[in-house]
């Protein structure tokens, strides 16, 4: 629903041409892949206190794609955090995750959250 309203808004109100819209969708798809890669790496690493780093890194990589990547990172991050709240995860941890998400989306270095000893592979 949110996506369809956004599409209609862009076409009717903003007058976005099809080329810009296709670029936005491409960036969003690439950004979603960046978010998935960060999530997969986090699960693979299974490293204590590394989740904030992977949150920041996924958002950072997605945001580098452009406005579509920023949008995808925000939608995915918000959906994940809302789900975590729904299942009873602590609000304090969710707030810290969102801060890491915003840090990365803003173009700040995700290594700020990198824990010591995390393998260089990540």
UniProtKB/Swiss-Prot annotation:
Major place of residence: secreted
Annotated signal peptide: 1-18
Gene induction: Up-regulated by cytokine stimulation.
Tissue specificity annotation: Expressed by the liver; secreted in plasma. Expressed in synovial fibroblasts.
Stored SMART domains: SAA
Entry's localization field: Secreted
Annotated segments matching region Disordered: 88-122
Ranges annotated as biased composition (Polar residues): 99-109
Any one GO BP annotation for this protein: acute-phase response
Protein name as it appears in the record: Serum amyloid A-3 protein
Protein's organism: Oryctolagus cuniculus
